[in-house]
């Protein structure tokens, strides 16, 4: 297993390549590993990994990874996000692709845990299991719209954490009510952030609202304190085109929270975690589940 992890860090993924790596670095490896019988063959490596209990392996690996964090560092924002591993689809046996739900430490750039589901719709049941693995007290949990469920919000608050949940059309009339609210009341806080570079200018405007009595009466969300509207506008100086996108969120944080930073941290999962899984660990090419 140690040899496998070293190989993955060296961007090798085939079992015969792992065997060759072990043979090439045999003198170095035997100083730290017990290798009385030498480097195992690629067939042996394959069989060993078929027998591993990956839940236990994950737990041990995460405990080890936790020790790598600098002393005194803590999680502030934990982004929960799902990803379909396209390479896991087995059309011959009619097995769909595996969907993984990850917990990502935004500050530390570390995957804190994951749960496997058969499709994206099962994220709703996987997210509470994933939260149970973690100590989330005092953190901010960010989740996309699939995880915007009253039971999940309640669990986060009960575990003494806060939430920022993406709001789309999957929660009855809550999104429509939020849009109507904007026409009736003024935001209690506003902020703006501008990024320039590569011939583009991106402006992010955040408006924070306190829920109206109508929303309180018709939507039961434990801990709900704010509703957030985030509008991102991108101006391309070369093509002279402007694209604007508006997203809504509900949160247990108060109006003074740095919503732009927290939400951008969640978006960073695509670049930070998913890119590593695809390019370094080759998840979209893996077939073993």
Language-model-detected regions and their locations in the chain:
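DNA-recognition alpha helix
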Residues: 14-33
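Structural motif
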Residues: 239-240, 287-289
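Short, small-residue-biased leader/transition segments that mark boundaries at the very start
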Residues: 2-9
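Short coil/turn segments at secondary-structure boundaries
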Residues: 19, 60-63, 75-77, 190-193, ...
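Active-site- or DNA-interface-adjacent structural scaffold in DNA-acting proteins
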Residues: 35-93
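Polybasic low-complexity intrinsically disordered regions
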Residues: 68-161, 168
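Short amphipathic alpha-helical "interface-anchor" segments enriched in bulky aromatics
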Residues: 254-287
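An anionic, glycine-rich sequence signature occurring as long contiguous blocks
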Residues: 165-264
